[in-house]
Amino acid sequence: MTKRALISVSDKSGIIDFAKELKNLGWDIISTGGTKVALDNAGVETIAIDDVTGFPEMMDGRVKTLHPNIHGGLLARRDVDSHLQAAKDNNIELIDLVVINLYPFKETILRPDVTYDLAVENIDIGGPSMLRSAAKNHASVTVVVDPADYATVLGELADAGQTTFETRQRLAAKVFRHTAAYDALIAEYFTAQVGEAKPEKLTITYDLKQAMRYGENPQQDADFYQKALPTDYSIASAKQLNGKELSFNNIRDADAAIRIIRDFKDRPTVIALKHMNPCGIGQADDIETAWDYAYEADPVSIFGGIVVLNREVDAATAKKMHPIFLEIIIAPSYSEEALAILTNKKKNLRILELPFDAQAASEVEAEYTGVVGGLLVQNQDVVAENPSDWQVVTDRQPTEQEATALEFAWKAIKYVKSNGIIITNDHMTLGLGAGQTNRVGSVKIAIEQAKDHLDGAVLASDAFFPFADNIEEVAAAGVKAIIQPGGSVRDQDSIDAANKHGLTMIFTGVRHFRH
């Protein structure tokens, strides 16, 4: 009995050669619509789908394959006599191979001019139904959804006249992943259209971006996935201009870096980062000076770190960066001379280019945190804050220079691991205490790091001070200005201590924990 294949593809890459090889192997080919036209024009003889169903395509192609003659031919078990008899009694011919890819729903909704009606029309119904029928019956039917699998299937058919069960099972698993992702994307689109903020089912889909050598540690397996609807301002979308493949830790650190830099749009800024904590932030009127400040902030910790710049990297800045061992540099662009300098004898230095004009769209994405057996979902900490809403709670008002420095410090503290303390002036970080289990411990670390630069410095805390001992430490170090959220039941104790030492202190009313 001649074996039959059903081919209906929107992505026609490789399909002509595939179909010709099938014909050479003696297969009959059933086809639909544009695929049939393409095959016929290439000289590949095909059977029209309506010759199999006995019904014409109708309703603008919405109904063409949803028919017992198709699904019976796919679902009939070859090892069950009653199935084969039912097929014979109803003149249903078996289908042994299905090659289908789906309407381009993803590509459609990514179009800037897409309409709701156009998106709906690009939801495939018949394709997923046939794929699922064939995949369910993979004991007998080979199902192909990816042109990358054409060669494997043809090779096995040529060698043995059929594919192996292992191949059919692998391809069936691929199909179920494919249709699940396709439906998840549709669900995501409709959920956004109706504005459902807390859906009872969370369906999101990601595509494999990179198979990684290992994870956070060598004993951990890891892979990098990118959202099916990619975000332009993302490490997954960054253009790599030089260097080795990004590691798991590189990606996490780089992601933290591009999140931090979003808050420093107004002036040229350079941020150095290590283990997802900023170790140096510098702002200036030009990017070269901003680099000087970021480097000076902590010339030890920057070694082996990541640097992100929010302006084009010029030759002067590149010359200063080149001698420093860095893992990654990220910027919106690089001058030709700067790129030549940075890559000279630095084949491993990872240099990434990222469209900073797409930052705003990245801020609306939800954050996902995996826990054992569950997933936490939250908005990003991108609340708009206006310094005019802040409250000076001490007798002394901040000077103009202190006010500028406090605003800078408040931007920087948001990305320090809790309990987080940062000491800055008005253009660079000076000391950082991160990740301590008590706040006064973070205060002491930040002071120790900044001890030679405390004149005119200010201090920011990501959460309230629970006790006045923190204020005493700050005052003893010579820091004169503090910014913190407030909100402790002992706030008045801290205010009294600040007044006693002539400090100025601002309450913002907004906490910035980061775990």
UniProtKB/Swiss-Prot annotation:
A GO cellular component entry from the record: cytosol
Domain of life: Bacteria
Domains as described in the record: The IMP cyclohydrolase activity resides in the N-terminal region.
Underlying gene: purH
Coiled coil: none
Matches recorded under SMART domains: AICARFT_IMPCHas, MGS
Record protein name field: Bifunctional purine biosynthesis protein PurH
Family classification: Belongs to the PurH family.
Enzymatic reactions: (6R)-10-formyltetrahydrofolate + 5-amino-1-(5-phospho-beta-D-ribosyl)imidazole-4-carboxamide = 5-formamido-1-(5-phospho-D-ribosyl)imidazole-4-carboxamide + (6S)-5,6,7,8-tetrahydrofolate; IMP + H2O = 5-formamido-1-(5-phospho-D-ribosyl)imidazole-4-carboxamide
Keyword Chaperone part of the UniProt annotation: no
GO BP, one annotated term: 'de novo' IMP biosynthetic process
One Pfam short name: MGS
Annotated metabolic or biological route of this protein: Purine metabolism; IMP biosynthesis via de novo pathway; 5-formamido-1-(5-phospho-D-ribosyl)imidazole-4-carboxamide from 5-amino-1-(5-phospho-D-ribosyl)imidazole-4-carboxamide (10-formyl THF route): step 1/1; Purine metabolism; IMP biosynthesis via de novo pathway; IMP from 5-formamido-1-(5-phospho-D-ribosyl)imidazole-4-carboxamide: step 1/1
Record GO terms (molecular function): IMP cyclohydrolase activity; phosphoribosylaminoimidazolecarboxamide formyltransferase activity
Record domain MGS-like: where: 1-145
